[in-house]
Structures are given as structure tokens and as C-alpha cells.
Amino acid sequence: MTSLQRKGPQTRILSTGEEEKLKRDQALVSAFKQQKLEKEAQKNWDLFYKRNSTNFFKDRHWTTREFEELRSCREYEGQKLTLLEAGCGVGNCLFPLLEEDSNIFAYACDFSPRAVDYVKQHPLYNAERCKVFQCDLTRDDLLDHIPPESVDAVTLIFVLSAVHPEKMHLVLLNVYKVLKPGRSVLFRDYGLNDHAMLRFKAGSKLGENFYVRQDGTRSYFFTDEFLAKLFVDAGYEEVVNEYVFRETVNKKEGLCVPRVFLQSKFRKPPKDPAPTTDSASLLRKEF
């Protein structure tokens, strides 16, 4: 089994059969059930981690390869990096980073109290290098746990897709408060026309590009335009915003699974430098 990866500005083009499937599956889940799913979102994720423990997701050792910002503490000896992993799950991204770089200090939070407990039980967990807490990013103020404008990078990796589209902007506004000016949110999540989107059965659709799994957890599939507008409207500047295509090929079984992700960086604008004494006096003379 092999995996091939490439990047591009446009999402995957569907086959005729795939297009027909999406056209057939237009019926939406009832408003009553959608309200119930929103109300029980935390419970459903907690049950997910109860069923799967720490075994569902693989450790993500690719993040430093894809995001050079996570390597920025390697430029000189003693350099530190303060990270927020927003939506840390059970630590599949967090612990590879802490293990790889001793100069990283991480804040990490998750919607699920059970996931937070698993992080604290991990053999690599060290309270001196990591502060972990439960948080609903759409409602709970990160400033209760993190000083304002103190974080060098924020990771949002397969997190925002689990949030209702009408509440996604609240997550971005929340992390904006703790991110240093001139620093970036590092994003990767499901892209439009991903194989997982096409596997949903009829009766799973909640809205445009938004679906519910059998266990009650939800997933949104992003376009680059939707994501860019979401970030820019929250005050960020676009740095990179592109699709990542991965094909997992099993030649023995004749299978090819086309995955589509969106990988992006959005920067909090740097603060304008304070005017010097000379420039300030010139301004006074002008006016």
C-alpha cells in the first residue's frame, strides 16, 4: 500500500457516478434532530473517545514538515516556541511535537473532558511543558487560561470541521485574542469532494458540505473560498490556502482512495510600529 501526495489550487473533480450520488442525497436531517445533535455535541465526542480510547487516530509526525513555523525554535540555542493546539484530542499531534523539540511549551484544549483526561494520562505528559484544559472554543474564553497575545502559533488540525458552520467564526475570534501579532494559525482539515464525504449514506446531510456520522459526530468539508472568507472576516490575513490531495493505493486489491484536505495559514496582522519622535513632530506640524 502506497500514499501519493500533491497540492493544488482547485479541489478534486468528481466522476459522473460521484456527482450523481451527491445529487441524489439532497434530503436534510430534520431541524429537530439537528438541534439535538448540536445540544449533544460534547456528549457524542466524549462517547467517541470512550469507545476508541487513544487508538483511533495515528500520531501526526508530519506537522513540522508541512508547517515551518513549528520548527522556528530551532534557529538558535535556547529559543522557545509557545504553541496552542486548539482541539488536541488525545494528543496525536501534541506529543510528537513535544518529543521532537524540548523548546516547545504548549497549551492544549479539547471539547471532550475524556480526551483531556487521556492527554494527562499520557506517559509523555509533563505539566511543566504543557497546560491542558477542557474548553468549548465557541463559548469559553481562552483568556481564562492563556495570557493575551502570548502564543507564537495556533494549530487547528481536523478540528474546525466538527464545529457547526454558523459557530466557526467564534473559534477564530477566540484564538485571535491569544495569538501574537504577526503570527499564524496553522490549519488542516477535510476538503470538498474528499472520499469521506462521498461515503455518507442518504439521510446524513445537515447542510451544504455538512454531514453527521452514525455516532452523532459531525463533519464539514471546506472549500478554499469559504475558509478564506471565514478567516478574513475574523481579522486574519491569508498567507497560504491550498488543497492537498493524497491517494492511498492498494495494488493487490485494486483500490485507490482519493483524499482531499485543505491546508492553510492565516496570519494575525502585525501591529503598526509606534511613530518615532521625529515623525510624530512632523505630523504635528502638518496639522
Curated annotation (Swiss-Prot):
Superkingdom is Eukaryota
Its chief place of residence is: cytoplasm
Which keywords does the record carry? Cytoplasm, Methyltransferase, Nucleus, S-adenosyl-L-methionine, Transferase, tRNA processing
Where do the segments described as Disordered lie?
A: 267-287
Reaction equations catalysed: cytidine(32) in tRNA(Ser) + S-adenosyl-L-methionine = N(3)-methylcytidine(32) in tRNA(Ser) + S-adenosyl-L-homocysteine + H(+)
State if DNA-binding is listed as a keyword: no
Q: What GO cellular component entries does it have?
A: cytoplasm; nucleus
GO BP annotations listed? tRNA methylation; tRNA modification
- Family statement drawn from the similarity comment of this UniProt entry: Belongs to the methyltransferase superfamily. METL family.
Description of how the protein assembles with itself and partners: Monomer. Interacts with SARS1/SerRS; interaction is mediated via tRNA(Ser) and is required for N(3)-methylcytidine methylation.
Under which name does UniProt file this protein? tRNA N(3)-cytidine methyltransferase METTL6
Q: What organism is this sequence from? A: Rattus norvegicus
Q: What is the lineage of its organism?
A: Eukaryota, Metazoa, Chordata, Craniata, Vertebrata
